[in-house]
């Protein structure tokens, strides 16, 4: 009788447990900070594609819907940001400053604060300075495998061994190592041990922003170019976040500057991105605070790399023309019946490489500019770097031959099809290549890097 009762209790316990598990919300995962989706360019790729948390190699081939079964890929260009990295030296110095305040000045009694003061140690060192971490290595290895599964006729062992896949990278260590990691993802996938594959360092393409004199002088090194950013930092939304942090720590308001507020946000973001830890630092922010921090970062990217100034996007003219030169070459070879000599181009750079190009192409442009005073009206904005530019962000352009000279171009951002702005077709996100070229005709005929980047005697106002 006791045995029967015991089995009855266990059976009902299992049923209840299963029911509870079925109702678990993935967003309630305590290992993921509640504010993780607001980390801007410091965010994980998995926050943009949450299904990867269950299976990092998962792909969904059904997202590619060519207008006919005849369509075959003939060329693929991927422009990819480097993987997860350490903070820069500047950020690390600010983190150390904040940590010292928390250790010596904070008098709050919350458990998370005691954890920082007694268990957490400042493990970031200045020599780390933006270098790739192991997670960043894995970001590119896994991306290589997923893209090879999504486009098996392009990113194939045959094309790799045949020299039809080309690798180009920025000279920065984190980009070179990301490129090596992408290649390793493929060679390990196909167990290639008898051959190595070269890459080319090309800062002219992948760090064009450093070489555009007008951009450097008028925007990058010009405080007046980011006046909206600085005004927002001094505004009521940001002041509220700083005061709430000071209250949580129980320190004077004067100790928590904007830079230290940003350092606290980065501590949460880096701990999660690098170590997959929901750090006690994350408790300094609620969702309202995180949205303000996200907007402050978006505002900076908007005015320094995005739509804020015309030269921001025009600095990417070289890369823009290079992409279309490759597409035209592939189209020409295909039309004449030749094998496409550069089937795949993998180009690894920075968020600062991708954002000006996305801007030049017209992606994520809102009807109103982002300013210091319209935070409340921009809650539904398209321009959100948390969605656009996580670590390992990628813009992939795939050229298809659909038969009878019908060439089509499919853009994907972070492995999701997107539509070229101004080329909306409800039937497909894969427009005719000729229509794409016509849409960007003015840029293809103009957009001269040397002319755009020349520093005039009387620079344009910013």
Walk through the language-model features, giving the residues of each:
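Cleavable N-terminal signal peptides of Sec/SRP-targeted secreted and luminal proteins
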Residues: 5-22
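Signature for phosphate-centric chemistry
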Residues: 23-166, 170-462
């Amino acid at each position: 009788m006791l045995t029967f009762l015991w089995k009855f209790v266990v059976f009902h316990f299992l049923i209840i447990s299963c029911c509870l598990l079925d109702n678990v919300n993935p967003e309630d995962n305590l290992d993921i900070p509640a504010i993780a989706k607001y980390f801007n360019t410091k965010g994980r790729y998995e926050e943009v594609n949450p299904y990867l948390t269950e299976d990092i190699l998962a792909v969904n081939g059904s997202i590619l819907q060519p207008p006919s079964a005849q369509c075959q890929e003939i060329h693929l260009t991927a422009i990819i940001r480097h993987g997860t990295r350490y903070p820069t030296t500047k950020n690390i110095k600010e983190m150390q400053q904040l940590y010292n305040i928390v250790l010596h000045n904070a008098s709050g009694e919350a458990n998370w604060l005691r954890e920082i003061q007694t268990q957490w140690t400042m493990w970031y060192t200045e020599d780390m300075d933006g270098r790739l971490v192991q997670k960043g290595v894995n970001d590119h290895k896994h991306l290589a495998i997923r893209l090879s599964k999504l486009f098996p006729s392009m990113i194939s062992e045959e094309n790799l061994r045949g020299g039809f896949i080309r690798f180009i990278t920025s000279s920065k260590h984190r980009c070179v190592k990301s490129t090596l990691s992408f290649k390793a993802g493929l060679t390990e996938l196909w167990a290639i041990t008898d051959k190595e594959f070269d890459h080319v360092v090309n800062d002219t393409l992948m760090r064009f922003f450093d070489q555009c004199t007008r951009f450097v002088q008028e925007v990058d090194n010009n405080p007046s170019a980011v006046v909206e950013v600085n005004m927002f930092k001094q505004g009521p939304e940001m002041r509220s976040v700083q005061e709430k942090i000071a209250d949580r720590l129980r320190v004077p308001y004067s100790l928590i500057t904007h830079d230290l507020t940003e350092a606290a946000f980065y501590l949460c973001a880096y701990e999660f991105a690098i170590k997959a830890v929901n750090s006690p630092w994350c408790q300094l922010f609620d969702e309202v605070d995180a949205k303000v921090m996200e907007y402050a970062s978006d505002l900076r990217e908007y005015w320094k790399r995005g739509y804020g100034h015309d030269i921001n996007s025009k600095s990417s003219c070289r890369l823009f023309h290079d992409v279309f030169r490759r597409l035209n070459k592939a189209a020409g070879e295909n039309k004449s019946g030749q094998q496409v000599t550069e089937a795949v181009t993998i180009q690894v750079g920075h968020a600062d490489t991708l954002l000006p190009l996305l801007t030049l192409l017209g992606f994520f442009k809102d009807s109103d500019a982002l300013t210091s005073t319209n935070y409340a009206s921009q809650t539904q904005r398209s321009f959100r770097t948390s969605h656009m530019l996580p670590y390992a962000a990628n813009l992939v352009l795939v050229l298809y031959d659909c038969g009878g000279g019908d060439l089509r171009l499919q853009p994907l951002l972070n492995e999701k099809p997107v539509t070229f702005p101004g080329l909306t077709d409800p039937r497909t996100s894969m427009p005719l290549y000729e229509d794409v070229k016509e849409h960007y005709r003015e840029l293809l005929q103009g957009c001269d890097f040397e002319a755009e980047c020349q520093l005039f005697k009387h620079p344009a106002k910013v």
